[in-house]
């Protein structure tokens, strides 16, 4: 008789269900023009009233819930980190089974990431950085969005930082989102929707 074994994978809280009212529309009308949907949970414009910062935006609710988004020149160092994170990761194997045992199901693969994130040059208040996940998706205009999910410390608290990266017309569109690690199920859907809402004038 075959004994069914439950795979030893960590249980995650369900991801938050997001709604249109969780976001508001933002557009930068300079060069390069871009627009995207910003999550209200990341707070208010911290650059309001300051001299124009160009095609960059910043929002913050606190020292541990904040985001930036910018249109910049392509950074080959950052591009290399995104690429190497996927190339150099190692799959974490499931423990071997005993005689007459099989897993109830095969879970999604989990990985160890061996790429050093130090060259990313994150803001100084973000420390103890380690890559914990990486992947890619598509925007509404079918641009590739790359993601890096980082475990880090911000303002003395265990946080997650998510980097997003898209390219068009030799420009990079880069996001940085920081939030408490324990609340990642609330924030990751917001980050994903914002990154995939990017539209860039051709």
Question: What would you call each of these model-derived segments?
Answer:
Residues 48-179:
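Conserved polar/disulfide-associated segments of primarily extracytoplasmic proteins
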Residues 1-74, 135-137, 154-158, 168-202:
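N-terminal targeting sequences that direct proteins away from the cytosol to non-cytosolic compartments
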């Amino acid at each position: 008789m075959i004994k069914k074994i439950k795979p030893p994978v960590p249980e995650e809280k369900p991801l938050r269900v997001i709604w249109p009212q969780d976001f508001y529309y933002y557009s930068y009308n300079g060069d390069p023009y871009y627009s995207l949907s910003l999550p209200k949970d990341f707070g208010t414009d911290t650059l309001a009233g300051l001299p124009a910062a160009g095609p960059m935006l910043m929002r913050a609710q606190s020292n541990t819930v904040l985001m930036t988004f910018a249109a910049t020149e392509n950074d080959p160092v950052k591009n290399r980190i995104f690429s190497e994170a996927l190339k150099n990761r190692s799959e974490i194997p499931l423990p071997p089974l005993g005689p007459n045992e099989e897993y109830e199901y095969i879970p999604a693969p989990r990985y160890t990431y061996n790429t050093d994130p130090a060259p990313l040059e994150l803001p100084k208040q973000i420390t103890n950085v380690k890559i914990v996940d990486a992947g890619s998706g598509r925007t509404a205009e079918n641009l590739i969005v790359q993601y890096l999910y980082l475990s880090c410390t911000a303002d003395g608290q265990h946080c997650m930082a998510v980097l997003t990266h898209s390219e068009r017309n030799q420009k990079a569109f880069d996001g940085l989102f920081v939030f408490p690690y324990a609340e990642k199920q609330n924030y990751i859907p917001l980050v994903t929707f914002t990154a995939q809402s990017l539209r860039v004038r051709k």
